[in-house]
Amino acid sequence: MSEQKKIKVTLVKSLIGTKAPHRACVRGLGLRRMHHTVEVLDTPENRGMITKVAYLVKCEA
């Protein structure tokens, strides 16, 4: 089987002053602190979370 594609997501802006649902999306992606990078699977669910908090994160394919 072929491996699923992954996206590297980095938190580049602080969560202070953001709305609770946006903080929940960042936590759902597995990001804990500034400049923390994680690799998530390229699924519609993860893409939706990334789109919702696009102003807080940087992504690379």
UniProtKB/Swiss-Prot annotation:
Keywords: Ribonucleoprotein, Ribosomal protein. This is Large ribosomal subunit protein uL30. Transmembrane segments: none annotated. GO terms for biological process: translation. It comes from Thiobacillus denitrificans (strain ATCC 25259 / T1). One of its GO terms (cellular component) is cytosolic large ribosomal subunit. CDD domains: Ribosomal_L30. The keyword Ribosomal protein applies. Pfam families: Ribosomal_L30. Part of the 50S ribosomal subunit. The keyword Coiled coil does not apply. Disulfide bonds: none annotated. GO terms for molecular function: structural constituent of ribosome. Belongs to the universal ribosomal protein uL30 family. PANTHER family: LARGE RIBOSOMAL SUBUNIT PROTEIN UL30M, MITOCHONDRIAL RIBOSOMAL PROTEIN L30. It comes from the Bacteria.
